[in-house]
Amino acid sequence: IGVSNFKPAHLEALAAETDTVPAVNQIQLTPAIPRHEQRAYNLTHGIVTESWSPIKGILDEPVIVDLAEKLGRTPAQIVLRWHIQRGRVAIPKSVTPARIAQNLDVFDFELDASAIAKIDALEIAGGAGRVGPHPAEVNG
C-alpha cells in the first residue's frame, strides 16, 4: 500500500496494528523542506519516499533562477533534476501539455556538485513552508 504524510509514529502504529509496512510514503519534500529524519526512517524501513509538490514555493529562489539561466533550463527542471540526483521520487502536478513535457525533459543534463550544494543550502529550518494539514492533526 501507499500512504501520504505519515510520520514515523504513524508508520509504527500502522505496522503494529496491521503488520503492514507501506511501499510508498508520499510527503511534501522540496529543497527548502528536505525532511531528513522522515526520509531516513523510510529508507531504513524499505519505504520509498515520494515527494508531492516537489517544486512548490522554490521556483523563484535566486539560486534556482540563476542555475536555470546558466544551464538553459526552466527553474522547475532544475529542481526536478535535483530530486533525481538526490535519489528521490518527485511527481509534479501539471495539466499543461507544454509544462508536462518540460517536466519530463530532465534526463539529458546533470547538476554539478556545486549546484547541488547551493540547492541543498535552501533548506528552511523547522520545515517552515509546509502546505496542507499536519498529519498529527488529522483525524486525531
Cite the ranges covered by each PLM segment:
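Beta/alpha (TIM)-barrel catalytic core signal, keyed to glycine-rich beta->alpha loops juxtaposed to Asp/Glu
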Residues: 2-140
